[in-house]
């Protein structure tokens, strides 16, 4: 039986600001929308870190808890916490089965964390994951390039998700944007 999945998360660093947006759709299998208003972008570590997930909901909550523990352990050092989470995620036989991806960001860093041990910081200050991630990333890049002078990070993040929601059937228009 298929699990709960599907979402789009987009994050951007732009003009000294940072924003992360996520839609609210939770899909069961390929045919049933179970929830429209899920909150997949969260503030962690005293509100100083944003984290968004795509993938299995239960797995993502497990990873959020683990990541928050790593942030506490390393006193908010985002790169170190992300690397340690990725190492544990990849090396533990039980955790290796978790099906989710995370985007995490603070005032200085924007990182993608995956269960294959990858911790990636983008060159262009933008990341997107999930079923509509490619659409959101393309939209975000276009918005930043052609309208970036007149748009904030929050506005670009929201618009990128709106465009992805118009294209991807697993992404809805109930968008939550968090800003640092």
Swiss-Prot record:
PROSITE patterns: PROTEASOME_BETA_2. The keyword Cytoplasm applies. One of its GO terms (cellular component) is proteasome core complex. It catalyses: ATP-dependent cleavage of peptide bonds with broad specificity. It comes from the Bacteria. InterPro entries: ATP-dep_Prtase_HsIV_su, Ntn_hydrolases_N, Proteasome_sua/b, Proteasome_suB-type. The keyword RNA-binding does not apply. GO terms for molecular function: metal ion binding; threonine-type endopeptidase activity. Its EC number is 3.4.25.2. It is found in: Cytoplasm. Keywords: Allosteric enzyme, Cytoplasm, Hydrolase, Metal-binding, Protease, Sodium, Threonine protease. Na(+) binds at residues 165, 168, 171. PANTHER family: ATP-DEPENDENT PROTEASE SUBUNIT HSLV, METALLOPROTEASE TLDD. Protease subunit of a proteasome-like degradation complex believed to be a general protein degrading machinery. This is ATP-dependent protease subunit HslV. It comes from Geobacillus thermodenitrificans (strain NG80-2).
């Amino acid at each position: 039986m298929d699990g709960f999945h599907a979402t789009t998360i987009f994050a951007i660093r732009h003009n000294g600001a940072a924003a992360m947006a996520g839609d609210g759709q939770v899909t069961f299998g390929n045919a049933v929308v179970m929830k429209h208003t899920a909150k997949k972008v969260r503030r962690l570590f005293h509100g100083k870190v944003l984290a968004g997930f795509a993938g299995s909901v239960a797995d993502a909550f497990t990873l959020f808890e683990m990541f928050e523990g790593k942030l506490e352990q390393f006193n908010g050092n985002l790169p170190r916490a992300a690397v340690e989470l990725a190492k544990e995620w990849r090396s533990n036989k039980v955790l290796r089965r978790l099906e989710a991806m995370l985007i995490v960001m603070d005032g200085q860093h924007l990182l993608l964390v995956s269960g294959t041990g990858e911790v990636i910081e983008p060159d262009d200050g933008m990341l997107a994951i999930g079923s509509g991630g490619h659409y959101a990333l393309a939209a975000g890049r276009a918005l930043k390039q052609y309208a970036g002078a007149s748009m904030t990070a929050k506005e670009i993040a929201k618009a990128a998700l709106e465009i992805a929601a118009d294209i991807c059937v697993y992404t809805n228009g109930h968008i939550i944007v968090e800003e640092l």
